[in-house]
Curated annotation (Swiss-Prot):
It comes from the Bacteria. Keywords: ATP-binding, Cytoplasm, Disulfide bond, Nucleotide-binding, RNA-binding, Transferase, tRNA processing, tRNA-binding. The keyword Isomerase does not apply. The active site is at C100 (nucleophile), C198 (cysteine persulfide intermediate). One of its GO terms (biological process) is tRNA wobble position uridine thiolation. The lineage of its organism: Bacteria, Pseudomonadati, Pseudomonadota, Betaproteobacteria, Burkholderiales. Belongs to the MnmA/TRMU family. It catalyses: S-sulfanyl-L-cysteinyl-[protein] + uridine(34) in tRNA + AH2 + ATP = 2-thiouridine(34) in tRNA + L-cysteinyl-[protein] + A + AMP + diphosphate + H(+). The record marks H125, Q345 as: Interaction with tRNA. Its EC number is 2.8.1.13. Residues 148-150, 310-311 are annotated as: Interaction with tRNA. Residues 95-97 are annotated as: Interaction with target base in tRNA. This is tRNA-specific 2-thiouridylase MnmA.
Amino acid sequence: MSKQKVVVGMSGGVDSSVTAWLLKEQGYDVVGLFMKNWEDDDDSEYCSTRQDWIDVVSVADLIGIDVEAVNFAAEYKDRVFAEFLREYSAGRTPNPDVLCNAEIKFKAFLDHAMSLGAETIATGHYARVRQNERNGRFELLKAFDHTKDQSYFLHRLNQAQLSKTLFPLGEIPKTKVREIAEQIALPNAKKKDSTGICFIGERPFRDFLNRYLPTKPGPMKTTDGKVVGEHIGLAFYTFGQRKGIGLGGSKDGSGEPWFVAGKDIASNTLYVAQGHDHAWLLSHTLSAGNTSWVAGEPPADGFACGAKTRYRQADAPCTFSSAGSGEGLFELNFDAAQWAVTPGQSAVLYDGDVCLGGGIIEHAVTGQPVAREPQKAALLNAR
């Protein structure tokens, strides 16, 4: 009886390396595939593509599997990076990792794996997949280790993708994964986890963005219309941002920090608010579009669920309702006010551990006070 062939996405990190080893131990015919999704800056200190490939080859040799590299840079720039720049240009804050998973790691990669004769693919993501015995649908669940759960980034995966996907680390705590890596003497056992957006690396984000988007200085105003400074360009700020604004405590002596509270694209104005719990930063309601549902259909109107509006956030109790426009929009009404709900980010819904899917945040209704210049007080969440 032939072994089931699985192609593992290997990045050179500990998680994907242990994933490959676990599947080999379970009797699968394992092939490693290293994806190169970004070509610029390979000679700089910020990108470690060459070293990552060396680590992949070393791990593959140790555990006894074949490995190959495939270049998806063109697909990445077309399907992910171009959208990333469009969103920032529009004053929003996108999450490219969500789009990368849906378009590259579980589409381009999946298609390539199938062309190699694979029956399934696997990655080192911390999440789980199961098939519902009652209706036969595949479900995306949070990882056993909730502190490492990555279902937020995977919420746009569909039934076809999930049916061909394995997440071996979904039931294992991160600490155990590290232990396994050391026990089997993986050459990268002590390698640090990657952080940040893959094509940016560890460089300052503003420096990277400035290479692709021009600066366009404009007024920085308080929520009541008082000019307090100048910004370098709306694309370089995100809702709720504290660092890099260039404002200290106010002259009224309150000394509370300032936060980005809104953008008006038409007048190129950046609005700032003082105090973490300022009304302009708190929202009870959001609307989202560009939806994707794991089951292929949205929840019923009035469904009580939990939602995350950013990664690592605890599920916030809320009620789901369709916007009734027929365009795939939905609204969430939260039981408690949410802080800095940011357009461009994903609102992801959960029923306990089950990830239902979600959409891209379009607008959040804040408890903002009346501005002196209401016609210019279009918040960041006004597209």
